[in-house]
């Protein structure tokens, strides 16, 4: 009785059936049922466990939903007061920390205009890093806050227009209450964050903030990853503009840069696998291979994962991380270049400087370089982010740079909860262990070093704006790869972990999997 129904409806129905409005529901939406490659596992109707297509895995197993209810049993902790001592002072600090307060007010969408000003806002399927100041402002965080959030009419959006994950004081989630062309955008759908606004906005050269909010709603209702969905729409538009597909292919939809109605129509067909949408539902990489005739050159993805809205052309360490990351291009697998510059470390020694030093990073690098010092930064922050994933904590609360709390505080919380002394060094080892296990899994499945590469478009000069002419330097990129393999303890020929690396991490049991 739940198959084929939208996520909001399924969640409400299941909560009513178990008699608990506070019950949480994990589910695949209709897109997961239809095995859309980038279907996500949804919770709270508007939270997506995105990327990698886990919603399609649920759909393939005919598993529609899992309902979880809390009990009255208190969580046992070794040192509850130790946890409080670390966490409670952070709550009033939210307003005092400019980085975190902007996140609380605008969500991640608060960075869209600055990304554009730096020439780092992917535009027209990564052909440019700039869509103009006025057009970026039209889809940015300040406008969303002032006009689209619930409560904006009464100037009460700080209270009514934000949501939070359980027990979080930052409250970075948006609640949009608006319309697009007479179609209601339900507050239950949340609201667009930076990635979603970029992929349905600048990627497609669209500056209609209401259309973007509606696209976000569709993705949440059908249960898909917004990055993959929006980037695939941009790929399709690019193909149409280049004459690789026509309205005959798209079922009469005349795609084009800046055409919001056509983009929404194509998205709807993709989420339901109708017509040409069935091709796009495989994601841009498979769609490009299917179309051929040069369409492959318009795909902007690594290991099948579409690139997020952080550009390696202006954040060089991401060129490396996107390439080597086991599940493809991901912007939340390491810290970004602007957070490790000599100027920033000098200006903020007590925050950025200390948190870098906690990871053993004492040689800050200019934003634009990709040298050995930057590779070390990328690798060590990759270990830190990997550890945070292992601990299942939010990367907007804990982290190695701008976040509310640093890795030292995370180690302290884990120590207080478990009673087992944990240091930052321990966390980096845990992160390295996870990363090497992921890499070994890929190797067993036949994914080789040849997949540690970047799409053709990143090596082509950007067009327009502050980043005009910039491109990933292929020689510099290849040299950084070699340095990374050496620092990570991976074989430079196969790209796989060396036997001694696995042994040092307590992963010797994986050696037979890699024929070591």
Protein language model annotation of sequence segments:
Residues 1-21:
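Well-ordered mid-protein domain cores that form the structural environment of catalytic cofactors
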Residues 15-18, 22-52, 58-516:
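Extended C-terminal regions of large enzymes
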